Each structure stands twice: as structure tokens, then as C-alpha cells.
Design a protein with these regions (language model features):
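C-terminal helix-cap and adjacent tail motif
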Residues: 155-181
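Phosphate-binding core of ATP-grasp and ATP-grasp-like enzymes
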Residues: 78-90, 121-132, 156-160
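Active-site loop/lid in soluble adenylation, ligation, and acyl-transfer enzymes
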Residues: 1-84
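A short glycine-rich, hydrophobically flanked beta-strand micro-motif that places a catalytic Asp/Glu
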Residues: 27-33, 129-143
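Short histidine-centered catalytic/ligand-binding loop motif
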Residues: 1-7, 89-116
Length: 181
């Protein structure tokens, strides 16, 4: 889609700057929107890549898995789950014990990852709430910078499920709503 790359970069820069102001370390250093380029710290991903989802509502794959136990749209208090980045296997869920057994991260690193996920998601959620938007869930990627667990990749509209007045917001519309474009 025309312009998606720069739109995602603008959105990422917006949130990375909010995180920086909140004292949360990420891989982001700077960006040049015109050149569609972002300067980042050198990081090492977890294993072959790990996606970390923070959920505030029971929707999507969470609801499909657990619908017999929870009402669709029920509130979740920053529930965190992890999946291995593996398209061929459908990005399978992996537990903290599984991550340790596979040598991807220790239990202590998982605790740090979970804490960081909830802090980052809270900053994003608060920013969206101020714009009359409701964050239902968001997907992040983290990695190592030295021994520190930090946010890497992007914080783009396509990585989050957001609602306005009870209706899901299309990712391209979300960028415009958030950035006032």
C-alpha cells in the first residue's frame, strides 16, 4: 500500500519519543521520515524472534483459544503472552518455562520482558486513550542490548487492535487519528 512504510515510521517515532520521555529504553536513536530511515542501537533478538502480546480485551486469537472460559471483549489487565516468530507453524504460543527450556531466555529475563511489555503498553494505551481510542491488544518485539532487554522493531498501527466508540479502527485510519493527519 502506497505510503505505508513512512506512515509506520511516523507512528513508531511518535511512540518511541513518548517512551523516551517516560524513561523507557528502546533501540530507537533517531529517524529521518523523508528518507524513510530509522537509526537504532545494535540489538540481538531472542532466539529466531519472539512476539510479545499485551492484551487489554479478550479478542482475536486469545478469545478463539479461551472463548469457553471468557466472554468476548471481556477486560484483561495487561495480560502478556509470547509467541515464537515462525510463520510456517503459525507463530506458536510459548510459556515462560518453554522459553527457558529452549534456551531462548531465563525466567528472570522473562520477568523483565513481561514488566517491560506492560510498561510500554501502558504508555501506548494512555496516549490512545487521550485521543478517544481504546487499545485492545498490541504486539511488540524485544531483544538484548548487551544484557538489557529492550523494545526493538516498530510500534505501528498494524501491530495493535484499537477501537473507537465500540468499532475497530482500520490501521491506516488509526495512523491518521493518532498523528492528526
Amino acid at each position: 500500500i502506497e505510503g505505508v512504510g513512512k506512515a509506520n515510521l511516523r507512528m513508531s517515532v511518535y511512540f518511541f519519543e513518548l517512551l523516551k520521555a517516560a524513561g523507557i529504553t528502546t533501540h530507537y536513536i533517531s529517524a529521518d521520515i523523508d528518507k524513510a530511515a530509522m537509526e537504532v542501537l545494535p540489538v540481538k533478538p531472542f532466539g529466531n524472534g519472539l512476539e510479545v502480546i499485551c492484551r487489554y480485551r479478550a479478542v482475536g486469537s486469545f478469545y478463539r483459544r479461551y472463548g469457553a472460559y471468557i466472554e468476548e471483549g471481556a477486560a484483561l489487565d495487561g495480560y502478556v503472552e509470547t509467541t515464537l516468530k515462525d510463520d510456517a507453524l503459525g507463530d506458536p504460543l510459548v510459556t515462560p518455562d518453554g522459553l527457558a527450556a529452549l534456551g531462548i531466555m531465563t525466567n528472570a529475563q522473562y520477568d523483565q520482558l513481561k514488566d517491560m511489555t506492560q510498561k510500554v503498553a501502558a504508555v501506548v494505551k494512555d496516549a490512545l486513550t487521550q485521543k478517544g481510542l481504546d487499545l485492545y491488544d498490541i504486539k511488540f518485539e524485544f531483544g538484548f542490548y548487551g544484557d538489557d532487554v529492550i523494545l526493538i522493531d516498530e510500534i505501528a498501527s498494524g501491530n495493535m487492535r484499537v477501537y473507537k466508540d465500540g468499532q475497530i479502527v482500520d490501521p491506516m485510519d488509526l495512523t491518521a487519528l493518532v498523528l492528526g493527519e
